[in-house]
């Protein structure tokens, strides 16, 4: 991409000397830049004044930067730093020399099935790592997938999409490109979970195999309608030679209902691998192995001079476009071992925007003279062996075992803890259970923030309504009388499938996290109470949160929710010295489920 008019090439931005414009989009610009203090080359994204001044955008982007900076996943480009300079937000990340997948597909057409699966497997690994840390990408598409000459794949732009496409899809010219990969629930008021990313990844798989996105339309309305109601296309019917088994993989990944999709991106990738013929499975494994062995993300630099083009001519699909730099070894000043540090906030700017248009080199490891090349080289060898082993394991891992049979409804009561088990956890000796509970609580409770009702109480009818659950069994335990010091409500809820149970917990986690730090007013039986939520701990399959009652002399409760097989475990433990009692009870119930 040439330096467009009004670019800031050649100027200084804080400590950065902006050397080359890499991309420009609706949110700002991306530059190759030299950090003049640290003496390394990075990619810097500069946000527009509009986004830099948006307080909601600023806070969400800071949070996403810290999370993305923590992700220890080789297929996520590390974020080094973020902040603002003279009121303009920026993001510093590793400079990666590569070509985005969209440009590869447009220039060379569809990929071979083994190569498509190898790339999808790597992106699935990045997504699963993000989802485990509570991050949704929300803009998975070929333009945000970067491919090196060795087919090492990176997923870029974590956090930016989630902060700008939640409720601000107003620029039609920019948004339509994203809408090609957007899950149906993104166009409605339904809850959006991590499975929207899985839908998008299935769309990308379809495009890798056929050369075109699943739905193409001249208008946004037609495109949205296709995602909501259109039949899911079959890759084998579009491009001869694609194994028919891919039709089922894409169909499940693009299921209209989130709960009908794969439970994880890795599950989708594994199913895609299984759809290949045996020779093609070996080919995909070779691609993965080669990409892992030839790429050293985050290793220390061993050369101060710009790299030269390899003497061996790479395949044409992997060649860099005219005007782009030659392929560079993945080297730079980041430590060769140990975790990538969480990015620090730079007092002086902000965040960058994704580049628009064609191929773009993205920040690979910064280049800097290293006085310890032997040490760095040794560390690089260790890392490449580890990554190679990971690639081999991913490609050649054994076929998945059959999932366990769903727990029968009549077995639910046996999963609950007995009185001695509850007393042991709560530090009491006289707690006794009441009558068994076999239906949801439909008491006329009013919560000022309705979405927080599930974070406050167990087995609530409004919370579970419409989720498809099939049965519930629960027990409430406390000391005798009205002046009890401990109170526990434990419930187990059966769903038709494990996927539906996991989807419910994921949805609950999203709602609980939105309640963190907030105070709600509860009206129950003509009485009013105020409860304040602490931060949510953990991520699905297990989440917990402590809520404290105002004016109750330290009375507080811990909510815990977990899932095992097709059973959701829903626990509330209350008392005056609450730590993680609900979490312990949930864990013990999960152990029982797993033994069924």
Swiss-Prot record:
Active site (catalytic residues): 139 (proton acceptor)
GO biological process terms held by the UniProt record: regulation of primary metabolic process
Superkingdom of source: Bacteria
Binding-site residues, ATP: 22-30, 45
Name recorded for this polypeptide: Serine/threonine-protein kinase PknH
Residue ranges that the UniProt entry lists as topological domain Cytoplasmic: 1-373
Modifications the protein undergoes after translation, according to the UniProt entry: Autophosphorylated on threonine and serine residues.
Compositionally biased residues, Pro residues: 307-318
Gene3D superfamilies reported for this sequence: Phosphorylase Kinase, domain 1, PknH-like extracellular domain, Transferase(Phosphotransferase) domain 1
Gene Ontology cellular component list: plasma membrane
Record InterPro entries: Kinase-like_dom_sf, PknH-like_Extracell, PknH-like_Extracell_sf, Prot_kinase_dom, Protein_kinase_ATP_BS, Ser/Thr_kinase_AS
Organism per entry: Mycobacterium bovis (strain ATCC BAA-935 / AF2122/97)
Disordered: annotated span: 292-368
Family matches, as PANTHER family: MITOGEN-ACTIVATED PROTEIN KINASE KINASE KINASE 20-RELATED, SERINE_THREONINE-PROTEIN KINASE NEKL-3
Enzyme Commission code(s) on record: 2.7.11.1
Membrane-topology annotation of the record: Single-pass membrane protein
MF terms in GO: ATP binding; protein serine kinase activity; protein serine/threonine kinase activity
CDD domains listed in its UniProt record: STKc_PknB_like
Extracellular face residues: 395-596
Keywords of the record: ATP-binding, Cell membrane, Kinase, Membrane, Nucleotide-binding, Phosphoprotein, Serine/threonine-protein kinase, Transferase, Transmembrane, Transmembrane helix
Record carries keyword Transmembrane helix: yes
Record domain Protein kinase: where: 16-276
Phosphothreonine: residues bearing it: 170
Catalytic reactions of this protein: L-seryl-[protein] + ATP = O-phospho-L-seryl-[protein] + ADP + H(+); L-threonyl-[protein] + ATP = O-phospho-L-threonyl-[protein] + ADP + H(+)
Localization annotation: Cell membrane
Presence of the UniProt keyword Aminoacyl-tRNA synthetase in the record: no
Ranges that cross the membrane: 374-394
């Amino acid at each position: 991409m040439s330096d467009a008019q009004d670019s800031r090439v050649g100027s200084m931005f804080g400590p950065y000397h902006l050397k080359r414009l890499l991309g420009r989009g609706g949110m700002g610009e991306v530059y190759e830049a030299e950090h003049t203090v640290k003496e390394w080359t990075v990619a810097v994204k500069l946000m527009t004044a509009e986004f830099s001044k948006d307080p909601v955008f600023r806070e969400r982007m800071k949070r996403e930067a810290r999370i993305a900076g923590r992700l220890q996943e080789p297929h996520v480009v590390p974020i080094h730093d973020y902040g603002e300079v003279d009121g303009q937000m920026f993001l510093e990340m590793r400079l990666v020399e590569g070509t985005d997948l969209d440009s590869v597909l447009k220039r060379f057409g569809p990929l071979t099935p083994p190569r498509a699966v190898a790339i999808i497997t790597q992106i699935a690994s990045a997504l699963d790592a993000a989802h485990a840390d509570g991050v949704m990408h929300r803009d998975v598409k070929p333009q945000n997938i970067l491919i090196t000459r060795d087919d090492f794949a990176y997923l870029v732009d974590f956090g930016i999409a989630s902060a700008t496409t939640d409720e601000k899809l107003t620029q039609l010219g920019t948004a339509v490109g994203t809408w090609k990969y957007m899950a149906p629930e993104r166009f409605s008021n339904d809850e959006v979970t991590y499975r929207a990313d899985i839908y998008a990844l299935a769309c990308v798989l379809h495009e890798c195999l056929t050369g075109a996105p699943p739905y193409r339309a001249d208008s946004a309305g037609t495109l949205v309608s296709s995602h909501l109601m259109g039949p899911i296309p079959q890759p084998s019917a579009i491009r001869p030679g694609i194994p028919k088994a891919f039709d089922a993989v894409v169909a499940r990944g693009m299921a209209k209902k989130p709960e009908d999709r794969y439970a994880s991106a890795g599950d989708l990738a594994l199913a895609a691998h299984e759809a290949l013929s045996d020779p093609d499975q070996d080919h995909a494994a070779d691609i993965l192995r080669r990409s892992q062995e030839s790429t050293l993300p985050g290793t220390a630099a061993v050369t101060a001079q710009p790299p030269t083009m390899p003497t061996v001519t790479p395949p044409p699909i992997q060649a860099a476009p005219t005007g782009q730099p030659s392929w560079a070894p993945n080297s730079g000043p980041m430590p060769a071992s140990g975790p990538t540090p969480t990015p620090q906030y730079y007092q002086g700017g902000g965040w960058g925007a994704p580049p628009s248009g064609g191929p773009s080199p993205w920040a690979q490891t910064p280049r800097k003279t290293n006085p310890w090349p032997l040490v760095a080289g040794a560390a690089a060898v260790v890392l490449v062996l580890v990554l190679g082993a990971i690639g081999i394991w991913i490609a050649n891992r054994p076929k998945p075992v059959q999932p366990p049979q769903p727990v029968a409804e009549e077995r639910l009561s046996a999963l609950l803890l007995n009185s001695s088990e509850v007393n042991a956890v709560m530090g009491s000796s006289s707690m006794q259970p009441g009558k068994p509970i076999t239906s949801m609580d439909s008491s006329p409770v009013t919560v000022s923030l309705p979405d927080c009702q599930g974070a406050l109480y167990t087995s609530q009818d409004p919370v579970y309504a419409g989720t498809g659950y099939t049965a519930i069994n629960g027990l409430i335990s406390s000391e005798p009388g009205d002046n009890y010091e401990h109170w526990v409500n434990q419930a187990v809820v059966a769903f038709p499938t494990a996927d539906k149970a996991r989807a419910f917990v994921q949805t609950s986690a999203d709602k609980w996290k939105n309640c963190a730090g907030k105070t709600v007013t509860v009206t129950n039986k003509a009485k009013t109470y105020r409860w304040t939520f602490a931060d949510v701990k953990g991520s699905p399959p297990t989440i917990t949160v402590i809520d404290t009652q105002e004016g109750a002399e330290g009375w507080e409760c811990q909510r815990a929710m977990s899932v095992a097989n097709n059973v959701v475990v829903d626990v509330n433990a209350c008392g005056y010295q609450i730590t993680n009692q609900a979490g312990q009870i949930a864990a013990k119930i999960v152990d029982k489920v797993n033994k069924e």
